[in-house]
Structures are given as structure tokens and as C-alpha cells.
Amino acid sequence: MDREELLRTITTSHRELAQLAERISDDRLRDPAMGDWKGKDVLAHLAWWHDQSVLVIEGLRAGRQPYDETDPANTTDGFNERVHREHLDDRPDVTRVAFNQSFERLQAAIRPLTDDDLFGADRWPWLGGEALVEMLLWDTSRHYAAHLEHLAPLAQNART
């Protein structure tokens, strides 16, 4: 895989989920999708992870630590809980737009990266020996696959 293939992979995955989201009415996006999360909350969550990836890329490229990993609030669960709380009142149309616009920002952040930036396991010490591409795949295509099962039923079953 190189940068162009990465961009094709995540863009294809994003397009598929964005098309699914377009088939879900705003009313259905207000329905439960995952525990106490509504469909719109899942889209807001995915958008936040896109933007988080952008912040990590920007921090790494600037030579700074993107965030303090030792802070107990900066865990995956901590981030997810905070994002859910902060976006509870977002309208479905807002989360749909955020999902798409945040992905555009992520694509723009990836484009100037070299293959070494993306695939070099030792390129960014802050990532603890993991290549940046792994984080990007988990924050995009792999993440979409994990939430597809939560959103797909909202597109299939019309509210009566």
C-alpha cells in the first residue's frame, strides 16, 4: 500500500458509509442505534475521530506531542464519552455534514504526507512503534465497518 492506495481505500469506505447515511432520514437518525447512542451520535462520533486524526497529523508534523496520553481523560473511552456528551443536541443534518466535511479535512491532511510518514513504523516515536497508517485506518475504514451494523438498520426500517 502507498499513500494513493490508502486514500482510495478510505475514500471508498467513506463514500459507502456516507451513501448509507444519506438513505437514513433525519427522523431515523434520532432513533437508537447503539446503546443510548442515536444514529446521529454515531455520525458525530465518526466525524470527531476524523478530526482527531487531523490533529494528530498536524501535531506530529509540527514536532509536538498531539495530546497528553498520560491524562486519564485521553483514553478511547474518555474521548468517546466526551464526544457523545458534547454532541447530544446536534441535529441530524449537522452530524451528516460534519461526517463529510471532517473527512475532507482528513484527506487534505494526508495528501502532503510521504510514504515514510505514513508507513514508517519508526517515523513518529509518539505512536510507539506503530505506523501512522494504522491509526488512520482505525479512524476511517475499519471504524466505519465497526459501526455499519449500528447504522444499516436505520436505513432499512422505516419508522411507523
Question: What are these language model-derived features?
Answer:
Residues 14-22, 50-58, 100-114, 145-148, ...:
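Structural signal for well-ordered, non-membrane alpha-helices
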Residues 8, 29-78, 118-160:
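Short, contiguous alpha-helical
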Residues 3-6, 68-69, 107-110:
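A broad, low-specificity signal for short, low-complexity segments enriched in glycine/proline
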Residues 2, 48, 52, 90-91, ...:
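Alpha-helical structural elements of signaling/regulatory helical domains
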Residues 1-16:
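Extreme N-terminal tail/first-helix region
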Residues 2, 39, 80-95, 126-134:
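Acidic/His metal-coordination segments adjacent to aromatic residues that form catalytic metal sites
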Residues 24-26:
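Extracellular-facing binding/remodeling surfaces
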Residues 76-119:
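Acidic/histidine-rich alpha-helical segments that form the ligand environment
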